[in-house]
């Protein structure tokens, strides 16, 4: 596995960069939403290219905002197959704060600092440790710009995703694609904003900045 020399900032509440409450969050409004979109040939071809991406490595940064708190971190993600991946979070000194390995959709190993292995669902484990509801089940497809699990989509002028909306139980995820990396083939997302809208009105937002892509 390629090892990146990265400094990672701890996620909330890993005792680093806990800031004051931020202002109320509002997702950008869209003028039109495409349901059951009958896509152009260009869009269909692009999605076909994305489906071929089964393995990748990315490194980048994440910023998290809610009504009460905000946090910043850097991450490393290695995707081996659709249901197999490895996630690392490290301290500024390069020490492993959190490590997660998922095999066939199940947690194979989860470690937090020196507390040993942790059992449970991947999303539940990460939420308990960080307080951030990261949608790991869908994130690997959203990261590459695939719309396979979308309920509603909006395309940009280049026939790539501009907005993706996914409904899960009483929650709604809205993903806004703000920038793409045009130096790689196929062109892949470089900056995303994810909004979680839930009935308790505790709206939450994450910004993902992908600094480096490796495709296999």
Curated annotation (Swiss-Prot):
Cysteines paired by S-S bonds: none
Family matches, as InterPro entries: LolA/LolB/LppX (IPR029046), OM_lipoprot_LolB (IPR004565)
Keyword annotations of the record: Cell outer membrane, Chaperone, Lipoprotein, Membrane, Palmitate, Protein transport, Signal, Transport
Chain residues carrying a lipid of type N-palmitoyl cysteine: 22
Superkingdom of origin organism: Bacteria
CDD domains on file: LolB (cd16326)
Pfam families the UniProt entry points to: LolB
Intracellular or extracellular location(s): Cell outer membrane
An example Gene Ontology biological process: lipoprotein localization to outer membrane
Membrane topology annotation: Lipid-anchor
Signal peptide: 1-21
Claim: Membrane is one of the keywords in the record: yes
Coarse class of the protein's main subcellular location: membrane
Any one cellular-component term (Gene Ontology): cell outer membrane
Keyword check for Lipoprotein: yes
Lipidation (S-diacylglycerol cysteine): 22
Coiled coil feature spans: none
Subunit structure: Monomer.
Role of this protein: Plays a critical role in the incorporation of lipoproteins in the outer membrane after they are released by the LolA protein.
Family: Belongs to the LolB family.
Identification of the protein by name: Outer-membrane lipoprotein LolB
Organism (species): Hamiltonella defensa subsp. Acyrthosiphon pisum (strain 5AT)
Lineage, top ranks: Bacteria, Pseudomonadati, Pseudomonadota, Gammaproteobacteria, Enterobacterales
